[in-house]
């Protein structure tokens, strides 16, 4: 379950020969969308849907349906903020009370273009989620385990762990505050 950013753990061979092979088996998506940023989610979930940014260096699949902007003026952060709010999650459950999301479910949602979303809030949620995701060994941007990043001024592993726990707790509280603020936009 990854909201805002994450679940990027597949590496796809993307050479010309590999793309030719995928195309010969019907497994290649429309090249118009290659290298484009979008909003994606997992088609099958165990609870609520979690929408997240798909960066331009990531591909999409039928198991990760993706919304792409029609033109450069379309705001993907707005789309992401709307889809991740609790009110829309409830609407999606009413539209399709199952563990699978379909493109038609998203298209059945009302138009929320008048919602006054704070892009900086969504940007911060993505930033925090991306940093969290990249702390996992399955992330292709993973560099080191935070617990083992002792600095010379840290007196003991115990103190370093306490410090990390405080950082993690504060990050969790910030995420919670920002998500609640995003939800309030639709409640008010």
Residue ranges and their predicted role:
Residues 4-188:
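S-adenosyl-L-methionine
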């Amino acid at each position: 379950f990854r909201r805002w950013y994450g679940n990027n753990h597949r590496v796809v061979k993307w050479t010309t020969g590999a793309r030719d092979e995928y195309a010969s088996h019907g497994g290649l998506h429309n090249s118009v969308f290659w290298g484009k940023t979008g909003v994606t989610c997992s088609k099958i979930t165990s609870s609520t849907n979690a929408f997240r940014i798909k960066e331009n260096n990531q591909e999409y699949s039928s198991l990760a349906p993706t919304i792409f902007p029609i033109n450069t003026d379309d705001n993907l952060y707005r789309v992401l903020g709307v889809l991740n709010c609790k009110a829309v999650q409830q609407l999606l459950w009413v539209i399709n009370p199952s563990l699978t999301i379909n493109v038609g479910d998203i298209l059945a949602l009302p138009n929320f273009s008048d919602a006054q979303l704070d892009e900086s809030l969504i940007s911060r949620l993505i930033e925090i989620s991306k940093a969290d995701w990249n702390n996992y060994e399955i992330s292709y941007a993973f560099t080191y385990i935070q617990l083992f990043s002792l600095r010379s001024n840290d007196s003991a592993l115990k103190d370093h762990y306490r410090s990390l726990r405080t950082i993690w707790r504060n990050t969790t509280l910030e995420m919670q505050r920002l998500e609640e603020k995003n939800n309030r936009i639709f409640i008010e």
